[in-house]
Amino acid sequence: MEKKVGTDRVKRGMAQMQKGGVIMDVVNAEQAKIAEEAGAVAVMALERVPSDIRAAGGVARMADPRIVEEVMKAVSIPVMAKARIGHITEARVLEAMGVDYIDESEVLTPADDEFHLLKSDFTVPFVCGCRDIGEALRRIGEGAAMLRTKGEPGTGNIVEAVRHMRQVNGQIRQIAGMTDDELMVAAKNFGAPYELIKEIKTLGKLPVVNFAAGGVATPADAALMMELGADGVFVGSGIFKSDNPAKFASAIVQATTYYTDYELIGKLSKELGSPMKGIEMSRLNPEDRMQDRSF
């Protein structure tokens, strides 16, 4: 029996439909409804938001399928869910459940410290994190239909997401300016598939959307990432760790859409209550850096 898999064109097209929007982490149906009402283009169903995963320690795994099912029943927008890096069975279970996207996520404890999933082997589209063009193109080479910056999840600190977005976009400009005879060396240096390096040279951009994620905690953070070239924004702990989640969620969505309307962003930021406290990066131990969990 021939195995059914989705084509890159279809998967990437589905991801393109989320462009310009906000995707919010939720842990129950009530939060999912708040996200949908605020204007989120999709939700990420998980058992704990990244800040709680970070605080709890231990091994973080795929969410209880009951949570994912409850979220899927509660909203009409697409539902994503996270699987551990390299965990084929978690990903197959989520695919069988009918989720719209799977995030092969460094927020969860990796199941395989050497190999990522062969995402082209699945029908469902995948989202993956990246810090630079090498990671981005390796994930696309495996079949990812959508990328996001890794940032540093659960910190409420935007600095790493900014670093990763600037790094990827700077390296795209570098490749776009190369002559054809320099591309093979670029593929070697970046550890990236040659055909995808050539595609970057031709397009002048990634062949898939690249969202900002990891540390978005305020409307201004979301707008900043759009200014830097993000195709949209993931918000993890920032919304439901704030004092007023519904108001905060709506403000993030509007700031993402109207990211150059600074007067509006100022108004949206008024009287939101306190955002999540956040963590200064220098206070993180090297072993606690989630962004270093994949390669």
Swiss-Prot record:
- Listed binding positions for D-ribose 5-phosphate are 25, 154, 215, 236-237
Under the heading Gene3D superfamilies, the entry gives:
Aldolase class I
User: Molecular function terms in GO for this entry?
Assistant: amine-lyase activity; pyridoxal 5'-phosphate synthase (glutamine hydrolysing) activity
Q: In which pathway does it act?
A: Cofactor biosynthesis; pyridoxal 5'-phosphate biosynthesis
The record ties this protein, via Pfam families, to: SOR_SNZ
Biological process per Gene Ontology, one example term: pyridoxal phosphate biosynthetic process
> Which reaction is recorded as catalysed by this protein?
aldehydo-D-ribose 5-phosphate + D-glyceraldehyde 3-phosphate + L-glutamine = pyridoxal 5'-phosphate + L-glutamate + phosphate + 3 H2O + H(+)
Indicate the transmembrane segments per the record.
none
Q: Does the keyword Nucleotide-binding apply?
A: no
Entry binding sites for D-glyceraldehyde 3-phosphate: 166
Keyword annotations for this protein, in alphabetical order, are: Lyase, Pyridoxal phosphate, Schiff base
As recorded in UniProt, its EC number(s) are: 4.3.3.6
The record's section on HAMAP family has: PdxS (MF_01824)
Q: Which family does it belong to?
A: Belongs to the PdxS/SNZ family.
Q: What is this protein called?
A: Pyridoxal 5'-phosphate synthase subunit PdxS
Q: What is the lineage of its organism?
A: Bacteria, Bacillati, Bacillota, Bacilli, Bacillales
Q: Which gene encodes it?
A: pdxS
